[in-house]
Amino acid sequence: MILPINTYSDEVLHQKAKPLKGVDADISSLIDSMFESMENASGIGLAAPQVGCSIRLLVLDVSCMKSYEDVPPMVVINPNVLAVRGKNLMEEGCLSVPGVQGDVLRPSEITLKYRDRNFQEHTEEFSGMLARVLQHEIDHLNGTLFVDRMEKRDRRRIQQELDDIAAGLVPADYPIARECSRGGEGPACM
């Protein structure tokens, strides 16, 4: 099922998400819907708060990108960044901030502890685009958007676009949730 994407001003995007205690049929169904919604929106990563569910779950699929064709889609539950290395400034965008891009400085490598779709624990090192996408999506789980990490002067330049998104004036090629306050209580989050 394709789920609507929450945008910039929706409250659920500014809250710290709650950890999952396991994966049941409802969470498994949510994971499938998140992959379907991400693909429908031509995204490479999607965090549960973006679909109105305040839980520590994200999905990503970077296989559409050159050099990442062999990377399988990932389900990441309860992620914890254990270490970071290096720095890299790169332009980012986000399904929750349609039509806006901006430069964000992030660590270029991370060590991540997380659980997969089967709730099995992993500790792995990630670099390059995969590290960036993971950090971007983990930010969503902590109530942070990429625009919150932009330089102040760059953020001021896009403020009108952010105001337009908040006012519902910016269209997207995928379903957008308006005035969504499910915050983890909607049917997709059960």
Swiss-Prot record:
Its GO biological process annotations read:
co-translational protein modification; translation
Q: Which residues form the signal peptide?
A: none
A GO molecular-function annotation = metal ion binding
State the reactions this protein catalyses: N-terminal N-formyl-L-methionyl-[peptide] + H2O = N-terminal L-methionyl-[peptide] + formate
Q: Name one Pfam family in it.
A: Pep_deformylase
Residues noted as binding Fe cation in the record, renumbered to the chain: 94, 136, 140
Explain how, and how many, cofactor molecules are bound: Binds 1 Fe(2+) ion.
Annotated EC = 3.5.1.88
Which keywords, in A-to-Z order, does the entry hold? Answer: Hydrolase, Iron, Metal-binding, Protein biosynthesis
Give the top-rank taxon of the lineage listed in the UniProt record for this protein: Bacteria
Alphabetical list of InterPro entries matching this protein: Peptide_deformylase (IPR023635), Peptide_deformylase_sf (IPR036821)
Query: Which cofactors, if any, are listed as required?
Result: Fe(2+)
So where's the catalytic machinery, residue-wise?
Answer: 137
Claim: Iron is one of the keywords in the record: yes
What family is this? Belongs to the polypeptide deformylase family.
Physiological role: Removes the formyl group from the N-terminal Met of newly synthesized proteins. Requires at least a dipeptide for an efficient rate of reaction. N-terminal L-methionine is a prerequisite for activity but the enzyme has broad specificity at other positions.
What PANTHER family does the annotation carry?
PEPTIDE DEFORMYLASE (PTHR10458:SF22)
Question: What's the protein name?
Answer: Peptide deformylase
Lineage of the source organism?
Bacteria, Pseudomonadati, Chlorobiota, Chlorobiia, Chlorobiales
